[in-house]
Curated annotation (Swiss-Prot):
The lineage of its organism: Bacteria, Bacillati, Bacillota, Bacilli, Bacillales. It comes from Staphylococcus epidermidis (strain ATCC 12228 / FDA PCI 1200). Belongs to the thiolase-like superfamily. Thiolase family. This is Putative acetyl-CoA C-acetyltransferase VraB. Coiled coil: none annotated. Pfam families: Thiolase_C (PF02803), Thiolase_N (PF00108). Gene3D superfamilies: 3.40.47.10. Signal peptide: none annotated. GO terms for molecular function: acetyl-CoA C-acyltransferase activity. GO terms for cellular component: cytoplasm.
Length: 382
């Protein structure tokens, strides 16, 4: 098989729902990233085989195709959009790497985009053209069959109860996320990932959801979202707007084009779990991935596990025995935000910039009861 490597990765700063990016459609969120890659790597962008993007709550159609055309890329580049719910961005990266492995192509753009602020409303179609009742809006997308389809909050509570994750543990983890994100934004680690771009005349270059002044006392005052529950708005991720792009390339092609550093794709795993406990999807996915490569968690230097809810991250960490000092070391989605279709690609982007970590994993728990995980190693092409 051919060896895929990721030689470039960038994201925009993530906006909060209804925040500074609220007026921008998904295509507009992607445009500065496409433009940046075109300016930095014109030869690479002229040789693209395809653009593979994750998106979950967009307008429909083929967003990857529309976005690349809006950005002025060659019309001969096709484009495909993937929906594996919150795992879409990671799935896009995995699929690009698999295409390179198979020899189907040598250069791909992979990533994801989401605008929760611009997500369209959806209504049920009337059964009859003569129906006169007021249209019924969908509250959310269905993820599983009736009776086995909890809301995200219900699923997070299910995990908290099953794995005995207390309210204090969840709040402590959320506090850690904000503290680490704030620290690593200020010291420049997270800033490496972010491409600043102008929004209404001013540069947008910091994630809007990070709360450096947040205290445990404030978190403790928040009411649970469900009666007698432990999940709150404070120990959960926010709804966000954001976009991420990466360049995936065949190793020898990368060397020919002068690239000497990045991360190489090793393997991936995708596994189904009970929809009621969807948040622990990373557990079987990571276990399968490690077994495939005859590794243990001790062989992994850093793990990026999407922080949809504190409860599911803590449960996954405990079941996988991940040392806390290897988990989400720069903070996670509880602080920086969760633009659904982009989040998995953002995890890989973070690993790309953790240049002192050799062997790393990105993993997601996914609506409907799925976990996916991908293993990478630091790559030097010289």
């Amino acid at each position: 098989m051919k060896q895929p490597v990721i030689i470039a990765a960038k994201r925009i700063a993530f906006g909060k729902y209804g925040g500074r990016l609220r007026h921008l459609e998904p295509e507009s969120l992607l445009e500065p990233l496409f433009n940046h890659f075109t300016d930095q790597y014109p030869k690479v962008m002229s040789l693209l085989d395809d653009v593979i993007l994750g998106n979950t709550v967009g307008n429909g159609g083929n967003l990857a195709r529309k976005s690349l055309l809006e950005a002025g890329l060659d019309f001969k580049i096709p484009g495909i959009t993937i929906d594996r719910q919150c795992g879409s961005g990671l799935e896009a990266v995995i699929q690009a790497c698999r295409m390179v492995q198979s020899g189907a192509g040598t250069i791909y753009i992979a990533g994801g985009v989401e605008s929760t602020s611009r997500a369209p409303w959806k209504i049920k179609r009337p059964q009859s053209v003569y129906e006169s009742e007021f249209p019924q809006f969908f509250e959310r997308a269905p993820f599983a069959r009736e009776g086995e389809d909890p809301s995200m909050i219900e699923a997070a509570e299910n995990v908290a109860k099953k794995y005995h994750i207390s309210r204090n543990e969840q709040d402590d983890f959320a506090y850690r996320s904000h503290q680490l994100a704030s620290k690593n934004m200020n010291n420049g680690n997270i800033s490496q990932e972010i491409l600043p771009f102008k929004v209404k005349g001013e540069y947008f270059n910091q994630d809007e959801s990070i709360k450096p002044q947040l205290t445990l006392r404030t978190l403790g005052r928040l009411k649970p979202l469900l009666n007698e529950g432990t999940v709150t708005v404070g120990n959960s991720c926010k709804k966000n707007d954001g976009a991420v792009l990466l360049i995936v390339m065949e190793e020898n092609r990368a060397r020919q084009l002068g690239f000497t550093e990045g991360i190489k794709f090793v393997n991936s795993a995708t596994v189904g779990v009970q929809p009621q406990y969807l948040g622990v999807g990373p557990v079987p996915a990571v276990n399968q991935l490690l077994a495939q490569e005859r590794l243990t968690i001790n062989d992994i230097n850093a793990v990026e596990l999407n922080e949809a809810f504190s409860s599911q991250v803590i449960a996954s960490q405990q079941q996988l025995n991940i040392p806390l000092n290897k988990l989400n070391c720069w903070g996670g989605a509880i602080a920086t935000g969760h633009p659904y279709g982009a989040s998995g690609a953002a995890l890989v982007t973070r690993l790309f910039y953790m240049k002192h970590q050799f062997r790393t994993i990105a993993t997601m728990g996914i609506g409907g009861g799925i976990g996916n995980a991908a293993l990478f190693e630091r790559w030097y092409g010289n």
